[in-house]
């Protein structure tokens, strides 16, 4: 009851703020509030198991989520394709750096997703007893930093926000991870920090382009007439940087290692939010700011997306480690994001956006269940699991529901997003018919493999060859109320979006249509080839209004 009254009071307060203060800085508060509160955690007493810190972190995460919801309810117009909730302050004018935040259709769904997943990750971290103050300090820093990635409207500020989450993730892996945590954490920081240099170089090049006074704001960069060769150089660098985070094969090898050592709440943040930063950045920078280069590299994105789907699905099928199996499954599903971004239809690009939201929810749910299962069985080897279905019937039901969501069962969000990507790409006349048929047919292989490895995984965990150490363990318990609540919170939007996609798609249709129009203008100048259909690229397939 107390949580109900707290939520009701918070929503009432947020609504009041929106009415009384029309220019309330929603996004700045969403970013700075969790970061500022994180620096209060060191003042908490060290005694006990960190109960006060846990409740404080959960309260901060919930308030941050409610503030982001308030920003959507009170100040966001779904029919407006432009940046809204804009806040701009000259921060370091001599360096051309401004505190510029805002939200459009591409960023608002991911801002909401970030605050929602983080709040559930804090609840998932309830059993953490080792250094709880540092753990929740890092989680709250990540919360503000990841919201900033989606909200900032300045490329240099974007780079700083992108870098802000590196150290928290490194420490969360290196301190609370498994036995190979140091290797996984080091590999993560080498891949992500090393590739980030391309973001900085591209930001500096674009900000100083054609002027002695730098300007890194997205609105300015979008109106710059960058030359073709300049766009290609920036595009390649940004593709590498964002491809590491997405991740794109073969830049993916850090992810299975990171997931293999992470704890459940860190899993949720990695799969639910971190990977989406790469997909969002590809749309924001490569597709929106570099349209000429994007038109030339889009076929490569399609091919890379198909490679992601097939390679990762085959690799997941062969994995005997539960965490690594789900990690490769995530890589496979992110391939649909690449195909959607590479398509020149609003339907396909809208599907890519929906896939990011959908996979954020589904990936977080699966990895939370992986952590919950490991806490009980103390093993990740599928060969050592089995026969626990009779003792963990509720856990089996939760696993089944989330696995069905992952294999894109109709009525769940994954089905809608993948169908939109497939339909948008196949019916897109920008590409030649043979190219579309070949790529779609290859991608379908991965779609067929997904239910095979997921359902066989369920059978091995719960109904495989019995492990007497597990089946006879009196301490092997079924799902707890906290765990059921977390999965229920994730399944509710998964099913809701699957039954009524407009819950999400309406928020970004205007922005996506504008983006695709911009890219199609660049495609018109590309001659007919074995991949491009030439003059047929004047058409645009609008996203659905279902």
Curated annotation (Swiss-Prot):
**Any idea where this protein resides?**
Cellular thylakoid membrane
Pfam families linked to this entry: Proton_antipo_M
Looking at its record, which EC class is this enzyme?
Answer: translocase
Give the catalysed reaction(s), semicolon-separated: a plastoquinone + NADH + (n+1) H(+)(in) = a plastoquinol + NAD(+) + n H(+)(out); a plastoquinone + NADPH + (n+1) H(+)(in) = a plastoquinol + NADP(+) + n H(+)(out)
| Chain segments annotated as transmembrane | 24-44, 56-76, 108-128, 132-152, 156-176, 188-208, 232-252, 263-283, 297-317, 326-346, 352-372, 396-416, 437-457, 484-504
**What EC numbers are recorded for this enzyme?**
7.1.1.-
Can you supply one Gene Ontology CC term for this chain's record?
plasma membrane-derived thylakoid membrane
Does Membrane show up as a keyword for this record? yes
Q: Supply the alphabetized keyword list.
A: Membrane, NAD, NADP, Plastoquinone, Quinone, Thylakoid, Translocase, Transmembrane, Transmembrane helix
Primary subcellular site in the record, as a coarse category: membrane
Q: Which GO terms describe its molecular function?
A: NADH dehydrogenase (ubiquinone) activity; ubiquinone binding
Q: Could you name the domain of life of the organism this protein comes from?
A: Bacteria
Nucleotidyltransferase found in the keyword field:
no
Q: Which GO terms describe its biological process?
A: ATP synthesis coupled electron transport; electron transport coupled proton transport
The record's listing under InterPro entries reads: NADH_Q_OxRdtase_chain4, NADH_Q_OxRdtase_chainM/4, NADH_UbQ_OxRdtase, ND/Mrp_TM
Q: How does it sit in the membrane?
A: Multi-pass membrane protein
User: Main role?
Assistant: NDH-1 shuttles electrons from NAD(P)H, via FMN and iron-sulfur (Fe-S) centers, to quinones in the respiratory chain. The immediate electron acceptor for the enzyme in this species is believed to be plastoquinone. Couples the redox reaction to proton translocation (for every two electrons transferred, four hydrogen ions are translocated across the cytoplasmic membrane), and thus conserves the redox energy in a proton gradient.
Family, per the entry? Belongs to the complex I subunit 4 family.
Name recorded for this polypeptide: NAD(P)H-quinone oxidoreductase chain 4
The organism is Prochlorococcus marinus subsp. pastoris (strain CCMP1986 / NIES-2087 / MED4)
